[in-house]
A protein has these predicted regions:
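N-proximal low-complexity "stem/linker" segments adjacent to membrane-targeting elements
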Residues: 1-25
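Acidic donor-binding segment of Leloir-type glycosyltransferases
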Residues: 20-61
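Glycine-rich, basic loop-to-helix element that forms the pyrophosphate-binding segment
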Residues: 62-78
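Short aromatic/hydrophobic "clamp" motif used to bind/position activated sugar donors
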Residues: 83
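Conserved donor NDP-sugar-binding/catalytic core segment of glycosyltransferases
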Residues: 95-126
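Catalytic beta-strand/loop signature of glycosyltransferases that borders the donor
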Residues: 159, 186-195, 207
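Acidic donor-binding loop at a coil-to-helix junction in glycosyltransferase catalytic cores
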Residues: 163-175
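Catalytic core of nucleotide-sugar-dependent glycosyltransferases
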Residues: 203-228
Length: 231
């Protein structure tokens, strides 16, 4: 199966290079990377030129700021059977795509996979699941955008949620909720590899923004999906 990996980026250069280095070392080679560049500068173009000989890169410039909006640009274009959303400041262990591919290939009933995450500095585990199979109630604890992979589908990100909007978070949880309910599917947790990402610093401004996103997510889940258990 081919992977389509989508990275919407703003304000980072060396971190994107680090991500590309990790992708160039993947043991599983059938993938493409979509970089949606929201920067006013063109520094990422050098990185694209340096790595496009190693794997397929689609470079897209966007004048609109917003994580969900720009992920949706790439979602409309991607060709792979499996979609992933690596952040512009994360990187993969060398066997991430291999392990995820094997998980999907051996479990036709699974619609999405989540991978263990570790902090880039301390290497401590941040997201893990003691359960092999994941359901909607497990998403908040086990899943975050950069550790999830989904079978190709028609669900799009809610552009009212996520970084660059008033509700600065919750977009990946909302995406998975919609995917699980629309396709009546479950997930599988892959614990034999890891994605590395800086641990979030819980400063007041971030907590406030994340709280707004979480509140919006819960309200949407209650009203639109009639999930009264969320209250």
């Amino acid at each position: 199966m081919r992977f389509s990996l989508i990275t919407a980026t703003l304000g980072r250069v060396e971190e994107v290079r680090c991500l590309c280095v990790s992708l160039s070392k993947q043991t599983f080679k059938d993938f493409e990377l979509y970089i949606v560049d929201q920067n006013e500068h063109h520094e990422l173009e050098d990185i694209v030129r340096n790595f496009e000989k190693n794997f397929i890169i689609h470079y897209i410039r966007s004048d609109v700021k917003g994580l969900s909006y720009n992920r949706n640009i790439a979602l409309r274009m991607c060709k792979g059977e499996i979609i992933g959303f690596p952040d512009d400041d994360c990187y993969y262990e060398v066997n991430v795509l291999q392990e995820v591919n094997e998980a999907f290939s051996s479990r036709e009933e699974v619609g999405f996979c989540a991978v263990t995450t570790r902090d880039t500095v301390t290497k401590r585990v941040c997201h893990i699941s003691q359960k092999a199979y994941l359901y909607k109630k497990d998403v908040l604890k086990a899943c975050i955008s950069y550790n999830i992979f989904v079978r190709k589908n028609t669900v799009m990100f809610d552009e009212r949620l996520g970084v660059g909007t008033y509700f600065s978070s919750g977009e990946e949880t909302d995406y998975l909720y919609s995917f699980i309910e629309n396709y009546r599917t479950c997930g599988f947790f892959v614990d034999r590899t890891a994605v590395y990402h800086p641990a979030n610093n819980a400063d007041i401004s971030k907590v406030y923004k994340y709280s707004l996103g979480f509140a919006a997510l819960q309200k949407k889940d209650w009203i639109m999906r009639r999930n009264y258990k969320a209250l």
